[in-house]
């Protein structure tokens, strides 16, 4: 018996090093994911594509056929170039590889409306797939540079992003280049994690010069780099205001400023003669508050509330008297309300001009800017006191959140600006899983109206449903449990479960409504009902996620230490 026990004991001692060695030698590669995903994407080549396809085709033509000083002036097509210079250079680069057969197909023609066939479609689809390798490379570096204990969880995060339903729907069906652009942004996040601050600033500056929507994340980067790389409080003792100069590491500040200014100079200096036109293209405030399809944010709820109040006021005259006391800008009579409804674009006609509300006060770009700025300040203040990677990503996520929730003319596709940074947070604490799953499920489902044809319904529904089941479970298994060692169930979690359960019947109901509209003419007057249901229900999920993350970020200090 003694010899037997000794052998068992010896076996246990030998198994521990073997387990460690297995973890060390296991390769977490995204290569197989790229191969499998590419097969699916190639099968989607002949399918639906949006007007964004002709947008990018036109940009290929502009950058290929015209001199650089005409790029932001050309307006033959309504799809004018309205991305920053690096993306224009990117389009020019792609245009150099257009085969003769594709050029003859109309790919490089500057015309009012593009006329092209399968060769152009195949070429442009391939450019999206190949450019997405930047995203795979960035996430592979993220995995490879992780500690052994983090690799499994970080592999789940990385694979969840490369297989994102958002990228499949928006890039490989609808048509855009978000995978490539987020690859550059994620490279900056990975550099921040590895404390490569100059590289972090460089990648973010490059991302910003590719797509200006990343400007919403700039406050988090600015405060993080300032606090982590430029300011040093380790030996600071305040005796006079002159001592404040000593906390600045001037050499680091100079290096940081040189890199950022160098990248922006490279991007914008060639367009110095047309800078006014360039800025007008990048920031078109002539567009309305909401897009044709309301993005699931605060203004969707605001628009819906205005429509409900309009109906109630017309049916209940006494309610109009009560509301007019509080809302001084409200029309005084029912006739005035009808006039405003007829004369104004009230937010459901699929237009991009100014949106006017009937009952509620009008929203201005200035108000949306101030609301966004206020909540972003709240998001970055904690980073001043704790410039850790975890705090930085939390701040980054909240900056993306508030820009999506309160921004002017926000597109539903911008939800990925929140989901992807949030993905990097989940492994740190399982309590973050509930707000993340709310955001991801609501956010990805809110993209469904982009693919409005019935033939695409099963693909978008099943792919998103399977993704949610697999990755919500995997993240729950790999994320860290809080210090108490027990997963605490909050009332918030129970409400989230109810939300998930109702999400599926909501999607099925809207799809049934869409199918029946083609059979029954009486349903034509409810043309925008399905979009409104999507927008409002998904808004509830996104807003709930923001509230949950904000609470944990600001009031659960142990989570971030």
From Swiss-Prot:
Residues 49-125, 176-205, 274-366, 412-431, 478-494, 549-561 are cytoplasmic. The keyword Glycosyltransferase applies. Residues 1-27, 147-154, 227-252, 388-391, 453-456, 516-527 are lumenal. It comes from the Eukaryota. Its main location: endoplasmic reticulum. It is a multi-pass membrane protein. GO terms for molecular function: dolichyl pyrophosphate Glc1Man9GlcNAc2 alpha-1,3-glucosyltransferase activity. Pathway: Protein modification; protein glycosylation. The chain crosses the membrane at residues 28-48, 126-146, 155-175, 206-226, 253-273, 367-387, 392-411, 432-452, 457-477, 495-515, 528-548. Keywords: Endoplasmic reticulum, Glycosyltransferase, Membrane, Transferase, Transmembrane, Transmembrane helix. It catalyses: an alpha-D-Glc-(1->3)-alpha-D-Man-(1->2)-alpha-D-Man-(1->2)-alpha-D-Man-(1->3)-[alpha-D-Man-(1->2)-alpha-D-Man-(1->3)-[alpha-D-Man-(1->2)-alpha-D-Man-(1->6)]-alpha-D-Man-(1->6)]-beta-D-Man-(1->4)-beta-D-GlcNAc-(1->4)-alpha-D-GlcNAc-diphospho-di-trans,poly-cis-dolichol + a di-trans,poly-cis-dolichyl beta-D-glucosyl phosphate = an alpha-D-Glc-(1->3)-alpha-D-Glc-(1->3)-alpha-D-Man-(1->2)-alpha-D-Man-(1->2)-alpha-D-Man-(1->3)-[alpha-D-Man-(1->2)-alpha-D-Man-(1->3)-[alpha-D-Man-(1->2)-alpha-D-Man-(1->6)]-alpha-D-Man-(1->6)]-beta-D-Man-(1->4)-beta-D-GlcNAc-(1->4)-alpha-D-GlcNAc-diphospho-di-trans,poly-cis-dolichol + a di-trans,poly-cis-dolichyl phosphate + H(+). It holds the Pfam family Alg6_Alg8. GO terms for biological process: dolichol-linked oligosaccharide biosynthetic process; protein N-linked glycosylation. It is found in: Endoplasmic reticulum membrane. InterPro entries: Glyco_trans_ALG6/ALG8 (IPR004856). Its EC number is 2.4.1.265. This is Dolichyl pyrophosphate Glc1Man9GlcNAc2 alpha-1,3-glucosyltransferase.
